[in-house]
Amino acid sequence: LNEQCLLIKKYAKNQWVTTNYIPNYDEGHIGGSPSLDFQSYTRYMVYGDNEGIGRRGYRVGNPLRIAWANDFFRPIQGTYGVMELQPGQVNWGSINPQPLPGAVRLWMWSVFAGGSDFICTYRYRQPLYGTEQYHYGIVGTDGVTVTPGGREYETFIKEIRELRKHSSSRETKPADYLARRTAILFNHENSWSIERQKQNRTWDTFAHIEKYYRTLKSFGAPVDFISEAKNLSDYPVVIAPTYQLADKELVDKWITYVKNGGNLILTCRTAQKDRYGRLPEAPFGSMITPLTGNEMNFYDLLLPENPGTVVMDGKEYIWNTWGEILNPPADAQVWATYKNEFYEGSPAVTFRKLGKGTITYVGVDSHNGALEKDILKKLYVQLNIPVMDLPYGCLLYTSPSP
């Protein structure tokens, strides 16, 4: 793709070039073409799944699908947009219902709120022949009649014009909002490595990451998915969920970030392999011992029909996919322990101050994300970072001027 971009620019020097990525984050191509002038993605929300909220949620879609894409694409170059946003009913899903009235407009506002610079749709007119005859456009088969989705595009355009009259180009973002700014460190190769050796059929790498991301969005936190090339010091808090592939250079970068005042959260399966997917000739999981102080006695995997329990602050949480039995140093706090099995009472979650910052290690993956949410709540309280408690599906952004 990068070579194609360079070839186009060779002959069309004044033409900008982008592409409409499908946000399949684990495939590794997003952000891999630095010659693109800006990033863009495609997003369809209603196509037969049932990930929305409530009985009719399938008519709106998963409320984090656009948010996650915004937070993933925006940090790459800053300038980004949506090249394909669903205009209405589509043809290619397993079941293709009508979107709920207002859904298209909601999607457009969600894209804009995340900092997008443009929104396009596919397509303008519903086709008369071909494989996508039943795919809506802005206008219908007569080329004149505006479809329901087209009317919502019309409404959004009017609203955004009105909003411009009331906006300021130099509006200051609230201090409490900026204090919550958090990065999620992401490398698709971690997913490649783990998904090929899951060790537990119930393990899901992206479901694990979402437990942290969903919590951050409920906090009203601005979130960036970033690569290792980014400056960690730009963020008060950095989470590296299940970051399996690592090396000394990366661990040293984490240590420097923490010692200089950063607050790092690492989760289970982190730094267990080197960059080539090999287990180091050293105690298992010891690559991050200089950072966390922990030694790993062993890890356990339970049957889903016979899960285990973790306890933190008197509250119990269910787990089965992955649990690490830790041996923490004297200067670490134990935040959560295992309640049952032959390692009952052993640490599962630790917290340690290092230099001017902190390192939290979460060695277990809970069933529903309740443990992960309470850990982040506990941490942000200790850091005096104010958080919100937004219901699922309600997202907070402070956006640049339209």
Task: Please tell me what each predicted stretch does.
Residues 14, 18-211, 298-300, 311, ...:
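Hydrophobic targeting/anchoring helices
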Residues 242-400:
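A conserved amphipathic helix/loop scaffold
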